Swiss-Prot record:
Binds 1 [4Fe-4S] cluster. GO terms for molecular function: 4 iron, 4 sulfur cluster binding; 5'-3' exonuclease activity; ATP binding; double-stranded DNA binding; helicase activity; metal ion binding. Heterodimer of AddA and AddB. It comes from Lachnoclostridium phytofermentans (strain ATCC 700394 / DSM 18823 / ISDg) (Clostridium phytofermentans). This is ATP-dependent helicase/deoxyribonuclease subunit B.
Length: 1147
C-alpha cells in the first residue's frame, strides 16, 4: 500500500508519463489489475489515448473508470444498492413537487415556488448539501451557527423543510448521484475488485468530502495509489495560500498526504516530470513563448519574456462577429500555409451562448468542418414542442397560440394549406375555447377567395376528436399522474410520432451533410428521452393526483432539464467549445474569443440561495460548502491557466470593443497580465488589417468579393480581378454558385409589363372599379396589379381597424338620416332630445349588426362602441349646426352611382348629397364622411391620388340632371367631413372652438350667390359677400373688401366643371393603361411622403431604390394656380404615355 504523486506544470507530460508507466506495468504483470480513475467527461478520451499508446493497441487488464462507474462495478459484485439513481431530470421533478406541497409552510421561499429558475436553484443547493455529506443533523448545526441572523435562519428553516420532504420522498426507493460514493464506502470492504490493484487518478483538480472518504478506503485496499497533481515542482514543500495559483493542487496533495499518514500508508517520493525530462517541456518544445506563459502567468513575481515572438497574439475587434470572422481568416491561413489539420485547432470562449452560433456560421461560410461542443436543450425539438403545445391547448382551453403551435410543430397529419386555411378562419372570427370547436362553423368572412368551410370543419373535427380524450383526462380532478402521462403517450401514438421521427432520421442521414448527421443523432435520441421522462414521472409521482397546471409545470421542468449530448461525427474537424467544460487534447493552435471583462472572469449576477457572506460564516465554523465568489475567482485563474497552456504552438486571444447590442465593453484583466509578461506583444486591430488574406476562403472569400464588386466604383483593383478569375475558372469552389452571386450583384430591374391578352384575362374586358382603385393605380401601378390583378389581400383579423370604425360610423349615420326621414323631421328643426335618443339607438343597432360580433367580445371593443356613440352624438350635433348655418337640405344618403366607358365601369356611393332649389336652378353640395383626418389637396387631385370628391361631384350632377331635367344644375361645393370629437383648450367658447375644428374642408363654388347659400353669415348688402367674415362650416373667409382671402378654398363654377371633366379623362387614361398591361413599379414620392410608407405589399413587391431599374416617381410640388393652369391644359397631359404628370424619376 502506497501513495505517490506525479507532479508537473500544465503541459509537462504528467498524463503521458503516468499512462506509459501503467502500460509498461500491465505488460509486465498481465494478471495484475490496473485502474485509472478520471472525471466522467474524460473517460472516452482517456480510453482512446491509452489504446493509441499501447503497443498491442488494446487495454486488456487496464480499466478506465469514473468514480460513479467504479461504484456501479463494485455494486455488481457486492450488491448494496437496490435503489434507483436519481438523475437531474427526476431530481428537478421531485424538488418542484415538494416545494409546491410545502409552499404554505415556507417562511421566505413560498412566493418563489412558481418563479422560473428557482427550482434549479433549490435543486442545486440540495445537490450541494448531498455532495458535502450535509444532512438534517448538519443543517441543525448550521442553524445554531446562524443564531442572531434572522434572514439566514429563515433560509435554513425553509431549506430544511424542503430537504426533509425531499429525503422522505426518496426513502428506500431512490438515491442521489451525490450519495452514491457514501453508499460505496459502506460496502467497499466487502469487495475484492480493487484488492491489490494499482490505482491511478488523473485529470482531477480537487475532491469532494465523499471522494476523499472513498480514497481513504482505496488506499487501504490497493497495492498503490498514484495521483497526478498540476503544480510547479518548486512549490511542492511550500504551503499554498488561497490567492496563489496552485492552492487547489496544494490543498489536494496535503489532504491526500494526511489520509495516508493517518492510515500509515507509505508515501513514495513524488515523480517530478520536468526534472526527469531534464527540464524539457513535453507540450511546449516548439514554443518558447508558450513555455514562458506557462511558467509565469498568475505568478508573483513573474519573469518577463523580452524576445520577439509570434506564437501568442492579441487582436481587438469591433464586436463578436468581427472576432469570429478574423479568427476564421487566420485559421484559413494556418490550414493553407502551415499545413495544419482541422483537428489541430480549437476555438473556445467563456460565452458560448454568444459565440457558438457566430463561430459556427463563419466556419461554415469558409467551408471548414467544425463541431460545437455543447449539450443541446430539447425544448425546441418538434416532439417536445408537440407535447408542450398539446398541454397548452388543454391548459389554455384551445386558445389560438396553443392550437397553432401544435399544428405547426411539423408532426400533425394536416397539410400546410389546410393549416393556413384553418388559421385564416380562426383569426378572422377570433375563435378560442373548446366550446367553439364543438359546434360546426358556418359563417364566412369577406375575402377575395372562396372560404372552404368543408376543409375548415374537417380540421376542426380532427382536432376535437384527437384532443377530447386528452382534455377529459387532464381536466378531471380524479386523474392520477399515471393516467395523465398515458393520455399524452396515447396522443403520441395517435399521431404516429415514433414512425415520423424515424422518417426524419433517415432523411437526415440520406442528405449526408455534417449538420444533418448531428440532427439525425439528436432525433434518434429524442423519442427515447421523452419516454424516459414519462417513465420517471410515473415512477416518482404515479398515483398522485395533481392540479393540471402543477402537472404541466413538473413535466415542463423535466423537459427543461433534459439535454441531448452529441458526439462529433468526424475526427478531423475544428472543435468549438466552452473554456471550462470542453476537453482539449493535443491541439496545436487555440483561439480564445471573447476575452472581455464580464466573460473572463465570468460575471456572477447572483449568489444563489446562500450568499458569499453566509458561506464564509459556515467556512469559519469548519462547515465545508461549495466555494465562495472570492474562492471561485481564484479557481477561475487556475482553470484559465490550464486552458491557456493547452496549445503546443499558437495562442490567439481576441476581445471585442462592443457587445452584440452595440454597448462599449472592456478587455479582460487577463490581457493586461499577459502583456506584462510579454512587453513586446502588440495588440492588433482587426478592423485595420489588410483584407488580402480574406480572399481565398471559399464562400467567405466570395462574400468579400461580392462587397467589392458592389461598392467599388470604376475599375476594380488588379488583386480583386485576379480573385474574380479564380472563382470563374473554378480553381476555388464554394457552396454558393458564382453565377447566382453575379446575378444578385449586377441585378437590374427590367419591367416589360403584361400583354393585352394577359391583362384581359386578369381583369376582364371591362374594369369593375371604384375611385379607390383608380387612386391605388395613381399611387403605384404595381401595387394596383398585386391587389386587383393577383387579388392579394391582407389576412382578415378579429379586430377593429380604422376602416371598420369608418364603416360603423357610416352605418350609424345612415340609420340616423333614414330615421329622420321616416319621422319626417328636418335637420333644420331637429329637437335636441330627439337627436340624442335617436343617436343612441342608431349606434346600438349598428353595433349589433356589425361584422362578426367583435364589438361585444372584449372590454376594449365595448369601449370603442362607446366612443363611436360619443363621436356620433358630436357629429349629429355639428351636422345639424352646419345645415342650419345654410339653406341646403339633405337630398339623399349613401347615393349609389355608376359610370361606364370603353374600359371602365365605375361604381360607388356618395355619403350625402345636399340640394337647394331656387328659381329653376338646383344647387348641389356633396359631402364625404371620413373617420380619419383627411384634407382636400388640389395637387393630389391633379396627380390622381385624391379623386373622390371630384368623381362624387361629377356623379351627383349627372344624377341630378336625370332627376331634374327641367332645372339648371350648379355645383355648390364638395367637402370632407372628418368624424371626430376633438379636445379643445378650455375657453369661454368651447362649442364654437369645436365647430371650427370640425368645419368641412374641400372646394367651394366662388359664386357670390352660392357661398351665402352654404353659410348665411356671408349674406352682405346688395348681393355682395359680407366683409371680414370667417365661416365655421366651410373653408371660406373674406377680407375687409369682401373678397376671398388666400386661405379660402374656392373655384369658379367653370373651373369646377373643368375639374370634373379632367378627372373623367384621367380615369379613362388610367383604365386604358391598366388594360394595356402597365404594371411597372412606379411608387410616387412627394415632399416627405411616398406610396410605399403604408403599402400592404412591401414584403412581396421587391421594390428597392438601391437596385438599378427601380426608382420613385418624384412629384413636382405645385401651388393652386399652377394646378389650375395644368388642368386647363389637359390635352398636353393626356398626350403622354403613362403617369407622366410632370414627375421625374429618382432614388
Amino acid at each position: 500500500m502506497s501513495l505517490q504523486f506525479v507532479i508537473g506544470g500544465s503541459g509537462a507530460g504528467k498524463s503521458y508519463q503516468l499512462y506509459q508507466r501503467v502500460i509498461e506495468s500491465s505488460l509486465k504483470e498481465p494478471k495484475g489489475k490496473f485502474l485509472i480513475l478520471v472525471p466522467e467527461q474524460f473517460t472516452l478520451q482517456t480510453q482512446k489515448d491509452l489504446v493509441t499508446m499501447h503497443p498491442k493497441k488494446g487495454i486488456h487488464n487496464i480499466d478506465i473508470l469514473s468514480f460513479l462507474r467504479l461504484a456501479f462495478r463494485i455494486f455488481e459484485e457486492t450488491g448494496g444498492n437496490d435503489r434507483l439513481v436519481l438523475e437531474d431530470t427526476g431530481k428537478s421533478m421531485i424538488v418542484k413537487k415538494v416545494m409546491m406541497e410545502k409552499r404554505n409552510d415556507l417562511i421566505l421561499f413560498g412566493a418563489n415556488v412558481k418563479k422560473q429558475g428557482f427550482v434549479e436553484e433549490m435543486k442545486s443547493i440540495i445537490s450541494e448539501l448531498a455532495q458535502y455529506s450535509i444532512h438534517t443533523d448538519e443543517l441543525q448545526k448550521m442553524k445554531e451557527v446562524a443564531k442572531g441572523k434572522p434572514l439566514l435562519n429563515h433560509k435554513l428553516t425553509d431549506i430544511m423543510t424542503i430537504y426533509q420532504a425531499y429525503e422522505e420522498f426518496l426513502q428506500d426507493k431512490y438515491i442521489n448521484s451525490e450519495e452514491i460514493l457514501d453508499l460505496l464506502c459502506d460496502v467497499i470492504d466487502d469487495s475484492s475488485f480493487v484488492n491489490d490493484s494499482e490505482i491511478c487518478l488523473d485529470g482531477f483538480t480537487g475532491f469532494t468530502p465523499s471522494q476523499y472518504k472513498l480514497l481513504s478506503h482505496l488506499m487501504k485496499k490497493a497495492k498503490s495509489v498514484t495521483v497526478t497533481i498540476t503544480m510547479d515542482e518548486s512549490q511542492i514543500n511550500r504551503k499554498q495560500e488561497e490567492h496563489q495559483l496552485f492552492y487547489l493542487s496544494g490543498k489536494m496533495a496535503e489532504k491526500l498526504t494526511d489520509l495516508a499518514i493517518t492510515q500509515k500508508i507509505e508515501i513514495k517520493p513524488p515523480i517530478l516530470v520536468a526534472s526527469e525530462n531534464g527540464g524539457y517541456s513535453y507540450r511546449f518544445h516548439n514554443s518558447m513563448a508558450l513555455s514562458a506563459l506557462e511558467k509565469n502567468i498568475f505568478r508573483y513575481p513573474y519573469k518577463s519574456f523580452t524576445e520577439e515572438q509570434d506564437d501568442i497574439s492579441i487582436t481587438a475587434a469591433k464586436d463578436p462577429m468581427a472576432e469570429a470572422r478574423h479568427a476564421v481568416i487566420e485559421i484559413t491561413r494556418l490550414l493553407r500555409e502551415e499545413e495544419y489539420r482541422y483537428k489541430d485547432i480549437a476555438i473556445v470562449s467563456g460565452a458560448m451562448e454568444v459565440y457558438g452560433d457566430i463561430v459556427k456560421r463563419e466556419l461554415e461560410l469558409a467551408g471548414i468542418p467544425c463541431f460545437v461542443d455543447h449539450k443541446k436543450n430539447i425544448l425546441t425539438n418538434p416532439v417536445v414542442e408537440f407535447l408542450r403545445s398539446a398541454l397548452d391547448v388543454v391548459t389554455h382551453n384551445f386558445d389560438y397560440e396553443a392550437i397553432f403551435r401544435f399544428l405547426k410543430c411539423g408532426l400533425t397529419d394536416f397539410t400546410m394549406d389546410e393549416i393556413d386555411l384553418f388559421e385564416n378562419y380562426v383569426i378572422a372570427f377570433g375563435i378560442r375555447g373548446k366550446y367553439r370547436y364543438e359546434h360546426e362553423w358556418e359563417r364566412k368572412y369577406k375575402t377575395n377567395y372562396e372560404v372552404d368551410l368543408e376543409k375548415i370543419n374537417y380540421v376542426r373535427e380532427c382536432i376535437l376528436k384527437e384532443f377530447t380524450p386528452l382534455y377529459e383526462t387532464l381536466t378531471s380532478k380524479k386523474s392520477s399522474v399515471r393516467e395523465c402521462v398515458n393520455a399524452l403517450y396515447n396522443l403520441l401514438c395517435t399521431y404516429h410520432i415514433e414512425e415520423k421521427i424515424h422518417i426524419f432520421v433517415e432523411k437526415f442521414k440520406a442528405q449526408g451533410e455534417k449538420e444533418d448527421k448531428l440532427r439525425a443523432k439528436e432525433y434518434e435520441q429524442i423519442y427515447r428521452m421523452v419516454l424516459e421522462i414519462f417513465d420517471r414521472m410515473v415512477e416518482l409521482l404515479g398515483e398522485d393526483v395533481l392540479p393540471l397546471k402543477e402537472f404541466r409545470d413538473i413535466l415542463d421542468t423535466g423537459f427543461r432539464e433534459a439535454k441531448v449530448g452529441l458526439i462529433p461525427p468526424s475526427i478531423d474537424q475544428i472543435l468549438v467549445g466552452d473554456i471550462e467544460r470542453t476537453r482539449l487534447k493535443d491541439i496545436k493552435a487555440l483561439f480564445f474569443l471573447g476575452v472581455n471583462d464580464g466573460i473572463v472572469p465570468k460575471a456572477n449576477p447572483g449568489g444563489g440561495i446562500l450568499s458569499d457572506a453566509e458561506r464564509q460564516l459556515f467556512a469559519d465554523h469548519e462547515i465545508e460548502l461549495s466555494p465562495t465568489k472570492r474562492q471561485t475567482a481564484y479557481l477561475t485563474e487556475f482553470y484559465l491557466y490550464l486552458n491557456l497552456t493547452k496549445p503546443q504552438n499558437k495562442l490567439y486571444l481576441y476581445y471585442s470593443k462592443l457587445d452584440v447590442s452595440g454597448k462599449s465593453i472592456r478587455a479582460s484583466y487577463l490581457l493586461g497580465k499577459i502583456s506584462k509578461i510579454f512587453p513586446k506583444l502588440k495588440i492588433y486591430d482587426a478592423d485595420r488589417k489588410s483584407r488580402e488574406d480574406e480572399l481565398l476562403g471559399t464562400d467567405q472569400g466570395l462574400s468579400y468579393l461580392i462587397s467589392v464588386l458592389r461598392d467599388y466604383e470604376g475599375e476594380q483593383p488588379k488583386l480583386w480581378r485576379e480573385v474574380y478569375h479564380l472563382y470563374v475558372s473554378g480553381q476555388i469552389k464554394g457552396r454558393i454558385s458564382l453565377d447566382k452571386v453575379l446575378q444578385g450583384v449586377f441585378y437590374q430591374n427590367y419591367e416589360q409589363g403584361l400583354t393585352k391578352e394577359v391583362a384581359r384575362k386578369l381583369y376582364g374586358e371591362t374594369l369593375l372599379g371604384s375611385v379607390t382603385r383608380m387612386e391605388k393605380y395613381a399611387a403605384c401601378a404595381f401595387a394596383h396589379f398585386l391587389q386587383y390583378g393577383l387579388s392579394l389581400e391582407e389576412r382578415q383579423e378579429y379586430k377593429i381597424s380604422m376602416p371598420d370604425i369608418g364603416s360603423l360610423f357610416h352605418e350609424a349615420l345612415e340609420r340616423f338620416s333614414k330615421a329622420l326621414k321616416e319621422l319626417d323631421i328636418s335637420w333644420h328643426e331637429l329637437p335636441e332630445d330627439v337627436r340624442i335618443s335617436l343617436g343612441e339607438r342608431c349606434v346600438r343597432e349598428a353595433v349589433e349588426n356589425f361584422g362578426n360580433g367583435i364589438l361585444e367580445s372584449s372590454k376594449r371593443s365595448a369601449y370603442l362602441a362607446t366612443r363611436v356613440e360619443r363621436i356620433l352624438q358630436r357629429t349629429t350635433k355639428t351636422l345639424t349646426h352646419q345645415l342650419q348655418q345654410g339653406v341646403f337640405e339633405p337630398g339623399s344618403y349613401e347615393q349609389y352611382f355608376s359610370h361606364a366607358d370603353r374600359y371602365l365601369n365605375l361604381r360607388g356611393r356618395i355619403d350625402r348629397v345636399d340640394l337647394y332649389e331656387q328659381d329653376g336652378k338646383l344647387y348641389v353640395k356633396v359631402i364625404d364622411y371620413k373617420s380619419g383626418s383627411t384634407s382636400f389637396d388640389l395637387m393630389n387631385l391633379y396627380y390622381g391620388l385624391q379623386l373622390q370628391l371630384g368623381v362624387y361631384l361629377s356623379a351627383a350632377m349627372e344624377l341630378m340632371k336625370e332627376q331634374y331635367p327641367n332645372h339648371e344644375i350648379h355645383p355648390a361645393g364638395v367637402f370632407y367631413y372628418n368624424l371626430d370629437d376633438p379636445i379643445v383648450t378650455k375657453s369661454s367658447s368651447v362649442e364654437e372652438d369645436i365647430e371650427k375644428k370640425l368645419a368641412m374642408n374641400g372646394l367651394v363654388n366662388a359664386s357670390k350667390v352660392v357661398v351665402p347659400l352654404l353659410d348665411t353669415s356671408f349674406c352682405g348688402d346688395e348681393g355682395e359677400l359680407a366683409p371680414s367674415t370667417k365661416s365655421t362650416v366651410i373653408p371660406v373667409e373674406t377680407g375687409k373688401d369682401g373678397t376671398f382671402t388666400k386661405r379660402s378654398s374656392v373655384a369658379k363654377e367653370e373651373e369646377l366643371i373643368t375639374l370634373t371633366d379632367y378627372i373623367k379623362d384621367l380615369m379613362h387614361r388610367f383604365s386604358e393603361q391598366i388594360m394595356e398591361g402597365k404594371v411597372r413599379h412606379n411608387p410616387y414620392r412627394a415632399k416627405n411622403r411616398n406610396a410605399c410608407t403604408y403599402c400592404s405589399f412591401q414584403s412581396v413587391c421587391g421594390f428597392d431604390c438601391k437596385v438599378s431599374g427601380f426608382s420613385y416617381r418624384n412629384l413636382k410640388t405645385l401651388n393652386k394656380e399652377e394646378v389650375w393652369n395644368l388642368i386647363k391644359k389637359e390635352d398636353e397631359f393626356f398626350g403622354k404615355d403613362e403617369l407622366d404628370t410632370g414627375a421625374t424619376e429618382g432614388n
